[in-house]
Structure formats: structure tokens, C-alpha cells
């Protein structure tokens, strides 16, 4: 199929529709803030529609991927390599954030007295019991019941059950073929539902952006513009610098990858939620040649353990507060901060407002930096969350391709075809290509 025949009119492109919707949302929120804040249900509704479908999609993808594998040892290898990659990249993100905030020093010269700050707004984030310990976090991965995990949309709990189900189905051998076929076909129905939901993505992006600008205003951007600029710059450095090097070492270009997921990036920009494109990212990673089992394990796990954007935010925000309140931090204190963040950032994975919760817990644990300083960045946190979500999204996509490459589960020919031809039907209609390219994977026959 030629590129020309695959092109859609601009007004039918999801990319163009989301750009238009976000622009209108910004204008409405700025000029009619009261009306803009009333658009919040549109954004919330879209995100709820996506969350409705995430758990069953993860289940189907993981089960089909694992049950269809010949070597079960590869599942453990994939998981181990993924966790190793996540830890290394999270550490690099923390270090990059620490380096940039020390070089640019966005908080220097503000001379804020912590005692003069209104801390009422941060009470909800710093209340005792909000932060999970490591043991509590691990126990929370085990659901009280399977139904409860799916009903609440707990990604890690659903993932655990899906892995166990996939192993059991594989062990069942040929007797499980009927179950396997049903789950595989059901997954295609679910992705068709995703396609239907994505048609209203521009409406969701419009509502979320109108609410954000209407509630917080563009003025809050300018009041702490130096921190905002430094943070966005750091995210760009990490994506195109650090992830760029990682991508190049593994045989693909991060620039082409970002172009490939441009629609998903715009939706995340509008909704400030990387979860809003999780199902579509899973489709696109498979379309780039990553094996279903790798996609099913890495993407959902990455949403809890591979939060590169959040890691950058944590070190930058902590040191910014110290700079703004004239609180000196020695090199040893900053290294200690880094070490504590390596632990605490994992404990808050998947928790709403996790950035503030982790930051508050870390500042309390390290000592020296006033927790009250969180009030300084409360007003712009929503705008910073967009950069966090965008960086997290790119990071998880790159992680999937890299881990797939390491385990030998990445079709490099399909990868380069997908990245070099972003306007083909594969990019516009991923599920249609999935139907054509994914062949039936028989459940392994039981061994006598």
C-alpha cells in the first residue's frame, strides 16, 4: 500500500483533532475560566472510559502472550531484565534531575520564609498514612480477590493474576486450546472498543485542558516559570539525550519513535494521564514487532516502576524548595536524598498524587528541607504533571522495545518499517494491522 493511499484528510486525523481540541481548551479556560472549570467531567469521563478497559486488556494480552510461549523460563528472564532496566533508568532520571537543578538553580534568590506559607492546600498530600511502606506495597500487589482487583482496576494485582493464569493455561497443554482461542478473540473485541473510545479523545483532551487553565490560570505558569522551564528542559534532555542514546544502542531512533506515538503524546498532554493511552500503546508496541508476552509484562509494570518523569520531578522539586527557602544542602545531603528517593518512589507507585506524597515523605525522612515548602509548587504541579506523564510514556515505550530486543523478541524489520512509515495504515489503524499480522499461537501440547 502506498503512503499516499494511506493518508487521511487532516481533519480526520486524531493528531490534528487533539491539537485543535487542546488549543480551544486553553482559550476557553483562559478567557472564560468559570466555564472552563465546568468542562472537567469531559476529561474525567474519557479517562474513566479508558480505565474501564485497561484491566481486561492487560489480562488478555498477558495470558495469550505467556500461554503461547514455548519456553516458560523466558517469562522470568523478561521480568528480571525489565526490573533491572527500570531501576537503572529511574536512577539515571533522579541523577539528571539533580544535576540540572544544581546547574540552573531555579529557586535561588526567592528568599521564601517557610513560616509564611499557607500549608492548608498540601494537607491532603502530607497526612500520616498516605505513604506506603515497601512491605505494604508488596502485600498490596496480592488482591483480596480476583473480582476486587478487576473491579478497582489495580494494574499490578491484575498483572499478577494474569501471569498465574497464563502459566496455568500453558501447563494445561492442548486441553486449554478452546480457552486460549476465546481469550485471543476477546482481546481483539476489546481493542475494537478502544478504537471506539479513542474517537472521543479530542473531547476528553478539550475538557481536561479547559479545566486546568480555568482553575489554575496561565498566571501560575509565569509566577514559577523558571522552575517550569527547568523541569521541561530536563525532561527533554532525558528523552532525547538519555533515552536517545539507549534507543540508538538498541538499533532505533527515539526521534522516529516519538513521531510514531505523536497522537498518544497529544492525548496525554491534554489529559495529564499516561494511563489514558495504555491500551493503544500496547497495540502500537506489538505493531512495531515486540512479542505480545513482552508487551503484556513490561508496559503495565512500567506504569508502576518506570516513572522517569516522576523521578526527575522528585529531585528537582526537593532541591528547588531548598534553594527557594535558603536551606543549604551539602553534597552528602543530596546523595542521601537520592538514595531515599530510590526507595520511596517505589512505595507510592500507582497512588493518586504520588509525586506530592513521595516528596513529603522523603523531605521528612531526610530532614533539613522544610515540608511546608511544598506549598510553593502546589499551584503549578498540575502543569508539571503533563511533562511527567509525557516522559513516563516515552520511557515505557522505549523500555518495551529495549527489553524485547534483549530477549530476542523484537522483529527489527517490522520495527524499522513502523518507525520509517508513520503515515501508513498501521499508524492510523493499529487494530486493523493487528488482525492481519497476528497469527494463531497454539497452546503448547501437554508433555506426557
Swiss-Prot record:
InterPro entries membership: C4_dicarb_transport (IPR023954), Na-dicarboxylate_symporter (IPR001991), Na-dicarboxylate_symporter_CS (IPR018107), Na:dicarbo_symporter_sf (IPR036458)
SUPFAM superfamilies: Proton glutamate symport protein
UniProt-listed PROSITE patterns: NA_DICARBOXYL_SYMP_1, NA_DICARBOXYL_SYMP_2
Pfam families: SDF
GO cellular component: plasma membrane
Protein name: C4-dicarboxylate transport protein
Job description of the protein: Responsible for the transport of dicarboxylates such as succinate, fumarate, and malate from the periplasm across the membrane.
Segments traversing the membrane: 13-33, 49-69, 81-101, 149-169, 193-213, 227-247, 294-314, 336-356, 357-377
Organism of provenance: Albidiferax ferrireducens (strain ATCC BAA-621 / DSM 15236 / T118)
Amino acid at each position: 500500500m502506498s503512503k499516499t493511499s494511506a493518508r487521511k484528510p487532516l481533519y480526520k486525523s486524531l493528531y490534528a483533532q487533539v491539537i485543535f481540541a487542546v488549543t480551544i481548551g486553553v482559550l476557553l479556560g483562559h478567557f472564560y475560566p468559570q466555564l472552563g472549570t465546568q468542562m472537567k467531567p469531559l476529561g474525567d469521563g474519557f479517562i474513566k472510559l479508558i480505565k474501564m478497559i485497561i484491566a481486561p486488556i492487560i489480562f488478555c494480552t498477558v495470558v495469550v502472550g505467556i500461554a503461547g510461549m514455548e519456553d516458560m523460563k523466558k517469562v522470568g528472564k523478561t521480568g528480571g531484565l525489565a526490573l533491572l532496566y527500570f531501576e537503572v533508568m529511574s536512577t539515571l532520571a533522579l541523577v539528571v534531575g539533580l544535576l540540572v537543578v544544581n546547574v540552573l538553580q531555579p529557586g535561588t534568590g526567592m528568599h521564601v520564609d517557610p513560616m509564611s506559607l499557607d500549608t492548608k492546600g498540601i494537607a491532603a498530600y502530607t497526612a500520616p498514612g498516605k505513604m506506603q511502606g515497601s512491605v505494604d506495597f508488596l502485600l498490596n500487589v496480592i488482591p483480596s480477590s480476583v473480582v476486587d482487583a478487576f473491579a478497582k482496576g489495580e494494574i499490578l494485582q491484575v498483572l499478577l493474576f494474569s501471569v498465574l493464569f497464563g502459566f496455568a493455561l500453558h501447563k494445561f497443554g492442548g486441553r486449554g486450546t478452546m480457552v486460549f482461542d476465546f481469550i485471543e478473540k476477546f482481546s481483539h473485541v476489546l481493542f475494537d472498543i478502544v478504537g471506539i473510545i479513542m474517537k472521543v479523545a479530542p473531547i476528553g483532551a478539550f475538557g481536561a485542558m479547559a479545566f486546568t487553565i480555568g482553575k489554575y490560570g496561565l498566571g501560575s505558569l509565569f509566577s514559577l516559570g523558571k522552575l517550569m522551564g527547568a523541569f521541561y528542559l530536563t525532561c527533554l534532555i532525558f528523552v532525547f539525550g538519555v533515552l536517545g542514546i539507549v534507543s540508538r544502542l538498541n538499533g532505533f531512533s527515539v526521534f522516529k519513535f516519538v513521531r510514531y506515538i505523536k497522537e498518544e503524546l497529544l492525548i496525554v498532554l491534554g489529559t495529564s494521564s499516561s494511563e489514558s493511552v495504555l491500551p493503544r500503546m500496547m497495540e502500537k508496541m506489538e505493531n512495531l514487532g515486540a512479542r505480545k508476552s513482552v508487551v503484556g509484562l513490561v508496559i503495565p509494570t512500567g506504569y508502576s516502576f518506570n516513572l522517569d518523569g516522576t523521578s526527575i520531578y522528585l529531585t528537582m522539586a526537593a532541591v528547588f524548595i531548598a534553594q527557594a527557602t535558603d536551606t543549604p544542602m551539602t553534597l552528602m545531603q543530596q546523595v542521601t536524598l537520592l538514595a531515599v528517593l530510590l526507595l520511596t518512589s517505589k512505595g507510592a507507585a500507582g497512588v493518586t498524587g504520588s509525586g506530592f506524597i513521595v516528596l513529603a515523605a522523603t523531605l521528612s525522612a531526610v530532614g533539613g528541607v522544610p515540608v511546608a515548602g511544598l506549598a510553593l509548587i502546589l499551584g503549578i504541579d498540575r502543569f508539571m504533571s503533563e511533562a511527567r506523564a509525557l516522559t513516563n510514556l516515552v520511557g515505557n515505550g522505549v523500555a518495551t522495545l529495549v527489553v524485547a530486543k534483549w530477549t530476542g523478541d523484537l522483529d527489527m524489520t517490522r520495527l524499522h518499517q513502523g518507525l520509517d512509515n508513520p503515515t501508513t495504515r498501521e499508524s492510523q489503524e493499529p487494530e486493523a494491522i493487528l488482525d492481519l499480522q497476528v497469527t494463531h499461537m497454539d497452546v503448547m501440547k501437554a508433555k506426557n
